């Protein structure tokens, strides 16, 4: 968590250097920087990004190019570009959507992708016109295993820790030295090939998860668990001394198998002095009502909640401001670490709870509150598809969030944690203002009946005058028990072994 005060002088110097280092030439993504050499047109963004793992099985493939696709290519796109399974080589049936007059393309699978499987894009011999085929062929990713159900849909083999970021980075970040090891702002996010038994999960002197410094002292931290995901968030910035992460005694929920003891030693990189920039989220839609995402073509800062129960018209619109901490850029020339501190809050508009999208349920969600549970970590990196100075830089962010609703009954149905939410986007400077356009997919549980899917088209803009930027809001409401299950009404229906669930505001 962030507890270091940042002076205005530090902010101005560090932010200016960071923008100069990573965002030089990014006046937009129009490719309008002239030079005497011919730069081939290329893919400049993909979600999932190359080598991304733990991709939700409901995720679309979002592409953006340095120039618009030719009409001939668009008319024949279903035969020129396919999404293919690595496992059997079969082509995935998708619906194609052209975005921003051909600058972008979205591929929406007609059914859920298989869990824990690898996929890639294939360009046929006809190609994509002026767009470099090899840049598109770099898009390869692996879907997340299931969070419930048969063990084979979660992952294969014995109970295994798949990764512990940032100790283990995805292939896109692994070769970048500035991103290949933890820093003093790091939160540790672990994913496993089986769901973790909550009764075996604890942090502390005798806990199954421990983080100790060079003196052997336990580092104060918070631990969050959801299915196959485990997050360890240090309460304070880590000191640049040797630390050891130990996991011992953790068990798989389905089989009871114990994880082999895990030990990793590292020295965090110091990121001071940092810049802190306040980014506006919620006022953008009101200021520019017709503004849509350049990546998805959807309205910005809305989270559609699409499911069989709710239909495909429900959404919550986000509002609020976020503070982003940026590491001292001269020390990180190839990947600048960034952080959104835990406790940051975004507000969401009420969600329409209509059965099958048509029949009113009588439930009123009220305002939806989304709280950043742990420090969200990420990087600003050079564009992985092109080294042209005219293309925008990549922004990557991993976050954990808690969602609650103001209404009592809906809160019991919708209140939940969403761990390991992976955000990918583009960072540009427009008229001297840092702008982030990003994409992510969340899969919240709906009414305890099914998992919904929400494609987040995120847009954030830094306030031009950071001296007068508003302070991001925190959730300062006193903690209250809002509902519980089985509750007073349904106790006669409770069975031995049923959990007691407490839902707070």
Where are these regions (language model features)?
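Bacterial N-terminal signal peptides that target proteins for export
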Residues: 2-13
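C-terminal motif of bacterial Sec signal peptides marking the signal peptidase cleavage site
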Residues: 22-25
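N-terminal non-catalytic regions of secreted/periplasmic and cell-surface proteins
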Residues: 27-82, 115-120, 124-125, 132-208, ...
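Surface-exposed loop/edge segments in extracytoplasmic proteins
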Residues: 87-96, 214-222
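Beta-strand-rich interaction surfaces with strong enrichment in secreted/lumenal proteins
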Residues: 95, 109-111, 220-221, 234-235
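Aromatic sugar-binding surface patches on proteins
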Residues: 101-107, 226-232
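Surface-exposed, short loops/turns at beta-strand junctions within beta-sandwich domains
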Residues: 111-117, 235-242
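Extracytosolic secretory-pathway proteins
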Residues: 200, 256-260, 267-486, 490-494, ...
